[in-house]
Amino acid sequence: MIEADRLIAASGRDREEVQDRAIRPLSLDDYIGQPVVREQMALFIQAARGRSESLDHTLIFGPPGLGKTTLANIIAHEMGVSVKSTSGPILERPGDLAAMLTNLEPHDVLFIDEIHRLSPVVEEVLYPAMEDFQLDIMIGEGPAARSIKLDLPPFTLVGATTRAGMLTNPLRDRFGIVQRLEFYSDKDLATIVSRSANILGLAIEDLGAYEIARRARGTPRIANRLLRRVRDYAEVRGKGQITKAVADMALNLLDVDERGFDHSDRRLLLTMIEKFDGGPVGVDNLAAAISEERHTIEDVLEPYLIQQGYIMRTPRGRVVTRHAYLHFGLNIPGRLGEGGDFSEPGDE
């Protein structure tokens, strides 16, 4: 199973990038949720504009689908400048980065997604560009090679990553602003769904928007994807209007339950309960039992279930918590009762 194949996958898809562009907010006033980030960025941007300076280099990190690219575009829009976008894996050689840097206008934003995947040689070129707005380029080869310095206009680098821990210390230290995006509340997601529906010209009730939001795993990208699929259902079977009942029937048909779990999530939890008595079970045994790769369990399935308190990692293996039994309407084993060995999701 591949993450991108799942309806509730947080990772993006190429076609969605085009679709999301139409509903993406362009200003901080339209940016929903993340109140601390929004307030801080409004302050930093206003101060930079007041001094006629470029904004400090900004690092945005957090789980996929929370709006890192959206925030980068908002920064450029609020600063009144252009944004040039690329990603870490695309910048394979120093020349690739140099070409982008030399095409920037004063105060422009250079957005690098997946910045943790920059190659070391490209990262070395980025250091003086960020710090001194200079580009060191090697001309020629062998004994005749020489280094020349090119002055760059002041610019803002906005880096986005889902894995801030993989950034090297020298790169991380060069960002003057660091922002972490958190999962969204159901209320904020419902507002996002209603806004997207309005832009798309869809008739949606508040309860219909909330029904989609509460199954979107705290992630705007998933909420907007579910909205499109519920729209299909509403147009064919619901007279074009998205009510709570229509959203519920559509999402049940799509196999997304009230907690945002899909078939793969439920299969993992039920396998642990039915075949391994709730655990502890090693990840290799679990992978064999559900015919998945180990990394799929660790990188795709587990994170959300752990974050929601349905699975724990312990020194002896994975265990399900009492929440998993309650979700399926099963009797809770005595060891998972109040004060049991695994009753607290944060313990290991």
UniProtKB/Swiss-Prot annotation:
Gene3D superfamilies: 1.10.8.60, P-loop containing nucleotide triphosphate hydrolases (3.40.50.300), Winged helix-like DNA-binding domain superfamily/Winged helix DNA-binding domain (1.10.10.10)
EC class name: hydrolase
Sequence segments annotated as region (Head domain (RuvB-H)): 258-348
Cell location: Cytoplasm
Binding site for DNA: 294, 313, 318
Keywords in alphabetical order: ATP-binding, Cytoplasm, DNA damage, DNA recombination, DNA repair, DNA-binding, Hydrolase, Nucleotide-binding
Keyword Coiled coil: no
SMART domains (UniProt xref): AAA
Catalytic reactions of this protein: ATP + H2O = ADP + phosphate + H(+)
Domain of life: Bacteria
Binding-site residues, Mg(2+): 69
Region listing for Small ATPAse domain (RuvB-S), in residue ranges: 185-255
Binding site for ATP: 23-24, 65, 68-70, 131-133, 174, 184, 221
Region annotation Large ATPase domain (RuvB-L): where it falls in the sequence: 4-184
Biological processes per GO annotation: DNA recombination; DNA repair
Pfam entry (one): RuvB_C
Principal location: cytoplasm
Record EC number: 3.6.4.-
Entry remark concerning the domains of this protein: Has 3 domains, the large (RuvB-L) and small ATPase (RuvB-S) domains and the C-terminal head (RuvB-H) domain. The head domain binds DNA, while the ATPase domains jointly bind ATP, ADP or are empty depending on the state of the subunit in the translocation cycle. During a single DNA translocation step the structure of each domain remains the same, but their relative positions change.
Assembly, per entry: Homohexamer. Forms an RuvA(8)-RuvB(12)-Holliday junction (HJ) complex. HJ DNA is sandwiched between 2 RuvA tetramers; dsDNA enters through RuvA and exits via RuvB. An RuvB hexamer assembles on each DNA strand where it exits the tetramer. Each RuvB hexamer is contacted by two RuvA subunits (via domain III) on 2 adjacent RuvB subunits; this complex drives branch migration. In the full resolvosome a probable DNA-RuvA(4)-RuvB(12)-RuvC(2) complex forms which resolves the HJ.
Chain's role: The RuvA-RuvB-RuvC complex processes Holliday junction (HJ) DNA during genetic recombination and DNA repair, while the RuvA-RuvB complex plays an important role in the rescue of blocked DNA replication forks via replication fork reversal (RFR). RuvA specifically binds to HJ cruciform DNA, conferring on it an open structure. The RuvB hexamer acts as an ATP-dependent pump, pulling dsDNA into and through the RuvAB complex. RuvB forms 2 homohexamers on either side of HJ DNA bound by 1 or 2 RuvA tetramers; 4 subunits per hexamer contact DNA at a time.
Family: Belongs to the RuvB family.
Record-linked PANTHER family: HOLLIDAY JUNCTION BRANCH MIGRATION COMPLEX SUBUNIT RUVB, PTHR42848
The name this protein goes by in its record: Holliday junction branch migration complex subunit RuvB
Taxonomic source organism: Pseudomonas putida (strain GB-1)
